Design a protein with these regions (language model features):
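A phosphate-binding catalytic loop at a beta-strand-loop-alpha-helix junction
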Residues: 79-98
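C-terminal domain-closing interface element
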Residues: 138-140
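Cysteine-based protein phosphatase catalytic domain of the PTP/DSP
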Residues: 2-81, 102-133
Length: 140
């Protein structure tokens, strides 16, 4: 059996990984919507994808994280299977994994959610500006 390069975040309905894993996840998991977190304009694909880039600019990071997490959580709550990705599946995808776990009640703090996300996918690496933004949003 071939090992998957992407991971299930929750209930075998929310998956995450890198951009190169999207097509495989769509095929294998019957994904309904792919959320692309990369800043650059995405290439053409054959599956349904929404572009929800997480900004690098400090003043836009929180809003872009909230928008991306909302797209994932809304699709999940609508009964859809979701795959979200950034380039490599660690930074932006890890950030959205943290927010998604908190929004869906699977963690109560950024630290707890980050540890859970890392336990699922060891590539998760939430960079400092994004961690601060997550803490501003969720650790109140």
């Amino acid at each position: 059996m071939v090992e998957k390069k992407y991971h299930a975040l929750l209930d075998d309905r929310i998956f995450f990984g890198g951009a190169a894993d999207a097509e495989e996840a769509v095929t294998n998991e019957k994904i309904d919507v792919v959320v692309d977190l990369r800043v650059k304009e995405p290439e053409k694909v054959t599956y349904y994808r929404v572009h929800a880039p997480i900004a690098d600019e400090a003043k836009q990071v929180e809003a872009s994280i909230l928008e991306a997490v909302d797209k994932v959580v809304s699709a999940y709550r609508d009964g859809k299977k979701v795959f979200f990705h950034c380039g490599g599946g660690g930074g932006r995808a890890g950030t959205v994994a943290v927010g998604t776990l908190i929004e869906l009640g699977q963690a109560t703090s950024v630290e707890e959610a980050e540890q859970k996300a890392k336990a699922i996918r060891n590539k998760v690496n939430v960079r400092e500006p994004m961690k601060i933004a997550l803490q501003n949003i969720y650790d109140k």
